[in-house]
């Protein structure tokens, strides 16, 4: 895995491919729309873009997004999908066309958002999940959030995930308003509600957790759950910072995702995480290079329930590695995804 070889006069180094554990491919169309306001203002733009999507548009537009992921060093994508079942099947076709492995994280939506997001019942949602599995498609269950799924939905989806040994992914603690609404409805914070409804297990990945408090992090640690950090998107949307140092001291696994695809570069996601940890702690090397590379690959694979995935090759002659003694540290410290071939 780490032995350089020379092909066509170019020395390369093979690494496990990076795993994109959280992606909304359709949101790539919003890149460059900076605008003003906050997350909730951006969400209105996102909803309008979602409304435009059809199976045909997914088959037409997603392959380019997935090829961009591949070019950046991702070889697996977890597509957190809430556009509808036909569009999910189209996303699988798009991934096959691009040549990237896909795990469909089919989102459950009971309330909020757009009508097209919603299933009429948990039974309908689970039937859709069954249909995807029946077609041989890798899947995970994904109650969108505690905003979108009430407690009884969370309980039933959690039981299904356990019964079928499936990954469970869910957005939580991304925005203060989400936490305030959850406290008003249940008297619990989002991750506390996930724990109460059986959603926290070793197969669970909580996406963002930028505003998780210490008690919530303790719950994740006890359950063996992971956090998916998406720092380029979180920066773009003003979501805040993952409390990286407090997460690490509890031994909680971290994986990464391109999320809204405002920027597609796993090395940048990892470098952002490293920078956040340094700023929060006032120290350097809070996260080792080995740890960061594990976040980029192995932890993502664990989050998606996969054991084997494709490698990616580093161009050792790339200008960004000139004069670098340790290739792995150089990748994290100073390279972009342009270094991959």
Regions from the PLM with identified roles:
Residues 31-101, 123-134:
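Alpha-helical scaffold segments that flank or form the walls of functional sites
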Residues 311-341:
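C-terminal cap of metal-dependent C-N hydrolases
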Residues 29-61, 109-123, 176-201, 223-226, ...:
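Active-site gating loops and adjacent loop-to-helix segments of metal-dependent hydrolytic enzymes
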Residues 88-209:
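Metal-coordinating catalytic core of metallo-dependent amide/deamination hydrolases
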Residues 1-15:
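Histidine-rich, glycine-flanked metal-binding segment
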Residues 99-101, 160-167, 199-202, 219-228, ...:
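Glycine-enriched alpha-helix->loop->beta-strand junction motifs that scaffold or abut catalytic
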Residues 168-175, 237-240, 245-269, 306-314:
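Short acidic/histidine-rich active-site segments
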Residues 16-28, 167-176:
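Histidine-centered catalytic micro-motifs
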């Amino acid at each position: 895995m780490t032995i350089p070889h020379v092909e066509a006069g170019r020395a390369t180094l093979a690494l496990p491919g990076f795993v994109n554990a959280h992606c909304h491919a359709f949101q790539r169309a919003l890149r460059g729309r900076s605008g003003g306001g906050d997350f909730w203002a951006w969400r209105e733009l996102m909803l309008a873009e979602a409304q435009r999507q059809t199976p045909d548009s997914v088959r037409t537009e997603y392959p380019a997004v997935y090829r961009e992921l591949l070019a950046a060093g991702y070889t697996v994508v977890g597509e957190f999908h809430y556009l509808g079942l036909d569009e999910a099947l189209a996303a699988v076709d798009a991934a096959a066309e691009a040549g990237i492995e896909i795990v469909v994280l089919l989102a459950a939506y009971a309330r909020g958002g757009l009508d097209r997001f919603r299933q009429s019942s948990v039974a309908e949602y689970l039937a859709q999940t069954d249909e995807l599995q029946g077609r041989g498609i890798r899947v995970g269950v994904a109650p969108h959030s505690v905003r979108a799924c009430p407690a009884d939905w969370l309980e039933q989806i959690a039981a299904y995930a356990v019964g079928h040994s499936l990954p469970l992914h869910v957005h939580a603690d991304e925005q203060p308003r989400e936490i305030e609404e959850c406290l008003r409805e249940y008297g619990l914070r989002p991750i506390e509600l996930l724990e109460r409804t059986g959603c926290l297990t070793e197969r669970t990945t909580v996406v963002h957790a930028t505003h998780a408090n210490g008690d919530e992090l303790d719950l994740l640690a006890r359950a063996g759950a992971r956090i998916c950090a998406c720092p380029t998107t979180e920066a773009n949307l003003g979501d805040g910072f993952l409390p990286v140092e407090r997460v690490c001291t509890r031994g909680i696994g971290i994986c990464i995702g391109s999320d809204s695809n405002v920027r597609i570069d796993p090395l940048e996601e990892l470098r952002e995480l490293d920078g956040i940890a340094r700023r929060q702690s006032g120290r350097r090397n809070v996260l080792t290079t080995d740890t960061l590379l594990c976040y980029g690959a192995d932890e993502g694979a664990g989050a998606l329930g996969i054991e084997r995935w494709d490698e990616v090759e580093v161009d050792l002659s790339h200008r960004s590695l000139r004069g670098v003694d340790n290739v792995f540290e150089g990748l994290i410290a100073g390279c972009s995804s342009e270094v991959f071939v």
